[in-house]
UniProtKB/Swiss-Prot annotation:
Compartment annotation: Endoplasmic reticulum membrane
Chain segments annotated as transmembrane: 112-132, 142-162, 169-189, 232-252, 257-277, 335-355, 422-442
Entry keyword set: Endoplasmic reticulum, Glycoprotein, Lipid biosynthesis, Lipid metabolism, Membrane, NADP, Oxidoreductase, Steroid biosynthesis, Steroid metabolism, Sterol biosynthesis, Sterol metabolism, Transmembrane, Transmembrane helix
Name of the protein in question: 3-hydroxy-3-methylglutaryl-coenzyme A reductase
PROSITE patterns given in the database record: HMG_COA_REDUCTASE_1, HMG_COA_REDUCTASE_2, HMG_COA_REDUCTASE_3, HMG_COA_REDUCTASE_4, SSD
Organism classification: Eukaryota, Fungi, Dikarya, Ascomycota, Saccharomycotina
Gene Ontology, cellular component aspect: endoplasmic reticulum membrane; peroxisomal membrane
CDD domains: HMG-CoA_reductase_classI (cd00643)
Residues bearing glycans: N361, N364, N382
Pfam family, one: HMG-CoA_red
Active site location: E618 (charge relay system), K752 (charge relay system), D828 (charge relay system), H924 (proton donor)
């Protein structure tokens, strides 16, 4: 408010306290207003106004001006008053104006220029489309592509600021609209895409080296960073050279400088912002894999403790790099960066009270307004008081302003609600919770790993005191000959145990009944076992220490079976992770059986070389496979085709009559029955999916063969759970309440037995592998001829097997290869029975080369669960690159089946060639009859 005294010599002064102003002064209201977004609309004609530039002033003694909400122009346009904070209409007007400007430029441009710019825009949009398409192929639908664009946009903003503000160069919008499409099309995003591909590929490969996300990212930057730096520096040099060469063309020179700065800042944003996004993507992938592995292992029937132990081993624990060690330089850099960031924001926040520039501007504006309207305000006899209202804006009533009004009304409602004393506190609390959750998610991989390790440590037993611990003697250097003596005792009683006299058996039994088995010494626990008071199988549970349980069981069985060999080191048991064995792989454990492991290869399978591990005690088996691999590689390697994937389980059910059994068979064979059973079965697992039901009737017995995909697990436990539930639904929901389940497995599967149903319909993975061997390789490597090899294969593998009435045994030694690979890779060795079903075909091509193929309809393998959770077997799966679950469920198991078929092919080729050349006996005498050492 402003006051002017009655004298003409006085001036207008600002008034804060009305008590200093006479009561009977004349009072006027000054209301400034503007008409915005007029466009083609006419403004209302008003009388008694003062106009200054775009601002109009209404001077009135009444409050009518304050009540103005709506004005009508001569053309009927309705203008509504509002605070000019909404900008939807403004942006729409800007868009329309920009479109009109572009349209005018197009009309005035030459045809060639229009075509050139159009091609540039097409190339730019294609580059953007290619960015998202390639990122999608990498494994990100939207976010990595969007993050790449944001990274480049930040580089553009930084470069634009430096160019226009620091270098004071003019970059017209027209130059940007014409130059940016060419720039994007030429530079592209190839280096960033390659970086993302390298990062995600390194993570897949890192499962063998267990690197964490920072290490994986660091390795990718080391590999891809120099290429990014080389390309960007080359283009920066080119743009700067162009700016010097075309210095007389200001527009081109300025844009070239801008482009060079964009590339320079792009290096910075790629190595900071985009790298951070990639690191987050890595950790999210790690969490996804851990969750997927946990669910598959639990579906496969493993205990929670075993699952946690496997997850700990398979987590990206991380190898040491410079990022792991505490670095003073890195810490100082981080603190300095954060300090500068907050300092700049604090300075910006405090600039108003540091310089007070805004106050000066406001004062100048106020007196400018006073000078413009002072002549229109009469001075009263007792002075005049003027109230200056905020500027009021009038906008034409059109669609954009109506939408804007609705949006502003909604925002205003939210703003009012947010200021409520209760709602504001709730929002603050929700913000705190949200921030905490986001911090948790950003560190979720490390938190996940840490908590997993802590949980495993809690579940593992505490270390015992010296008197109850497994006694391990100090290492003693002995001669090689001494290590084979049966009298060598690996574990003798500890000093504390020997010094302490054993308590009477009755006292030991009382301590056992009181639950104090852990406090007993080893010999006392052995006495409980030999007395029949403590079962052998309960040692792990009672002692809470798996390793100690194994040691005591060895001593107990040594006494019970009078087998002192168990007190020697002939059957080792130390240095083994029994936590994975207990509840998953074996019971009543007394040690582990070392097997020699050889490697055959490299064998090229579908264009990729593999070194295939084989655990065997048969001499010349690995050598035979190696010879086959060499011959196959000379022909270009193995080509494989997977024709079917489905594990089976065949329960047997019984009905009161043949009629009811037949009705159930018809229902199961119908589309309705298949669909109902699929719904019931699929509800039991995320991974098991029922493919088909096959039925067979024998009297009133009905055999149902469930064929199911089971992801990367071999799937017997997973599918059994689904079968039990589906049969339960049949009796309780589907109307077959008179059905009785005879057995969940009715041998119609068929598991671990030779059966025509597996040979005909397949079980597990059905794979066909083929290779073409040059005739020169047959002669030089296999030491035979194509004709002789083909002849032996027909007479032996086909006619000979037919004469024997074989089912699926039309091969030379498929079981040899399958079993050796299964033992090395943690597969079920008993399933070599059906997995070894194979027919080997060999023919001579028109060129005289040898074509070999093996067809194996029932390879039963998995890359999670079972023996694959053990570290030695798991490490061999890592050697093949198929350990654990794949990103595409089931892909690792399918690839493993192809590897098995391929090594069988090499073994078949080598053995048949040896038979054709008459070398079989000679090779076995050389490799399998080595003289025993004395």
């Amino acid at each position: 408010m402003f006051y002017h005294g009655a004298s003409a010599n006085q001036h207008w002064i600002a008034v804060d306290d009305l008590s200093k102003v006479p009561v009977d002064v004349d009072h006027y209201n000054v209301v400034p207003f503007q008409f915005r977004r007029a466009g083609e609309y006419k403004e209302p004609v008003l009388s008694g106004i003062v106009e200054l530039d775009e601002v109009k002033f209404v001077v009135s003694q009444s409050d009518a001006a304050e009540q103005w909400q709506q004005l009508t122009a001569e053309d009927g346009t309705v203008w509504r008053s509002r605070a000019y904070h909404g900008k939807l209409g403004k942006y729409s007007d800007m868009a329309v104006g920009a479109f009109n400007k572009v349209l005018n430029l197009v009309r005035g441009a030459e045809t060639f220029d229009i075509a050139l710019v159009t091609c540039a825009y097409i190339a730019m949009f294609y580059t953007l489309f290619n960015l998202f398409a390639r990122m999608r192929a990498v494994g990100s639908k939207v976010w990595l592509g969007l993050s790449t664009l944001v990274s480049s946009f930040f580089a553009f903003l930084f470069a634009l600021y430096i160019t226009t503000r620091v270098l004071d160069l003019s970059i017209p919008f027209l130059s940007l609209s014409e130059g940016i499409p060419f720039f994007v099309a030429v530079v592209g995003f190839n280096n960033k895409i390659l970086l993302a591909e390298k990062v995600l590929q390194n993570q897949l490969n890192a499962q063998s080296s267990k690197n964490d996300a920072p290490t994986v990212l660091y390795q990718a930057l080391r590999e891809q960073g120099p290429l990014l730096l080389r390309d960007h520096l080359f283009m920066i040099t080119a743009f700067l050279g162009c700016s010097f060469y075309a210095s007389y063309l200001d527009g081109l020179k300025n844009f070239c400088i801008l482009a060079a700065l964009i590339l320079a800042f792009d290096i910075l944003t790629t190595s900071t912002f985009l790298s951070a996004i990639l690191s987050l993507k890595l950790e999210i992938n790690q969490i996804h894999r851990s969750t997927l592995l946990r669910e598959q292992l639990e579906d496969d029937g493993l205990t929670e403790t075993t699952v946690d132990d496997v997850l700990k081993s398979n987590s990206l624990a991380g190898t040491k790099t410079f990022t792991d060690a505490p670095s003073t330089l890195v810490t100082v850099a981080k603190v300095a960066g954060v300090s500068v960031f907050f300092g700049l924001h604090f300075y910006g926040f405090g600039s108003a009270w540091l310089s007070d520039l805004s106050a000066g501007n406001e004062t100048n504006d106020t007196f400018t307004l006073y000078d413009a309207v002072a002549d229109q305000i009469p001075i009263g006899s007792n002075g005049t008081l003027v109230t200056l209202f905020p500027t009021r804006f009038f906008l034409p009533e059109k669609l954009s302003t109506q939408i804007e009004a609705v949006v502003l009304s909604f925002i205003g409602l939210i703003s009012t609600a947010a200021r409520d004393k209760y709602i504001s506190k709730f929002i603050l609390f929700a913000f705190a919770v949200s921030a905490s959750i986001n911090v948790y998610l950003l560190n979720v991989a490390r938190i996940h790993t840490t908590r997993l390790e802590d949980a495993i440590e809690l579940k593992k037993p505490k270390k015992k005191a010296s008197k109850t611990a497994v006694s391990v003697p100090k290492a003693v250097v002995v001669k090689d000959s001494e290590t084979t003596k049966s009298s060598e005792i690996l574990h003798s009683s500890s000093e504390s145990e020997s010094e302490q006299s054993s308590r009477p058996l009755e006292q030991v039994i009382e301590l056992y009944k009181d639950g104090k088995v852990k406090t007993l010494v080893d010999d006392e626990v052995v006495s409980l076992v030999t007395a029949g008071k403590l079962p052998l199988y309960a040692l792990e549970k009672q002692l809470g220490d798996n390793l100690r349980a194994v040691a005591i069981r060895r001593k107990a069985i040594s006494d019970l079976a009078d087998a002192p060999v168990l007190r020697s080191n002939k059957l080792p048991y130390l240095h083994y992770d029994y936590d994975r064995v207990f509840g998953a792989c074996c019971e009543n454990v007394i040690g582990y059986m070392p097997l020699p492991v050889g490697v055959a290869g490299p064998l090229i399978i579908d264009g990729k070389p593999y070194h295939i591990p084989m655990a065997t005690t048969e001499g010349c088996l690995v050598a035979s496979a190696m010879r086959g691999c060499k011959a196959i590689n000379l022909g270009g390697g193995v080509t494989t085709v997977l024709t079917k994937d489905g594990m089976t389980r065949g329960p047997c059910v019984k009905f009161p009559s043949l009629k009811r059994a037949g009705q159930c068979k018809l229902w199961l064979d119908s589309d309705e029955g298949q669909e109902e059973m699929k719904k019931a079965f699929n509800s039991t697992s995320r991974f098991a999916r029922l493919q088909h039901l096959q039925t067979a009737l024998a009297g009133d017995l009905l055999f149902i063969r469930f064929r199911t995909v089971t992801g990367d697990a071999m799937g017997m436990n997973m599918i059994s759970k689904g079968v039990e539930y589906a049969l339960k639904q049949m009796t309780e929901v589907f109307g077959w309440d008179d059905m009785m389940v005879v057995s969940v497995s009715g041998n119609y599967c068929t598991d671990k037995k030779p059966a025509a149903v597996n040979w005909i319909n397949g079980r597990g993975k059905s794979v066909v592998a083929e290779a073409s061997i040059p005739k020169d390789a047959v002669v030089k490597v296999l030491k035979s001829s194509v004709k002789a090899v083909v002849d032996v294969n027909v007479n032996k593998n086909l006619i000979g097997s037919a004469m024997a009435g074989s089912v699926g045994g039309f091969n030379a030694q498929a079981a040899n290869m399958v079993t050796a690979v299964y033992l090395a890779l943690g597969q079920d060795p008993a399933q070599n029975v059906e997995s070894s079903n194979c027919i080997t075909l060999m023919t001579e091509t028109e060129d005289g080369d040898l074509k070999v193929s093996v067809s194996m309809p029932s390879i039963e393998v998995g890359t999670i669960g079972g023996g694959t959770i053990l570290d030695p077997q798991g490490s061999m799966l890592e050697l093949l690159g198929v350990r654990g679950p794949a990103d595409v469920p089931g892909e690792n198991a399918r690839q493993l089946a192809k590897i098995v078929a391929s090594i069988v092919l090499s073994g078949e080729l080598s053995l048949v060639s040896a038979l054709a050349a008459g070398h079989l006996v000679q090779s076995h005498m050389q490799h399998n009859r080595a003289a025993a050492k004395k």
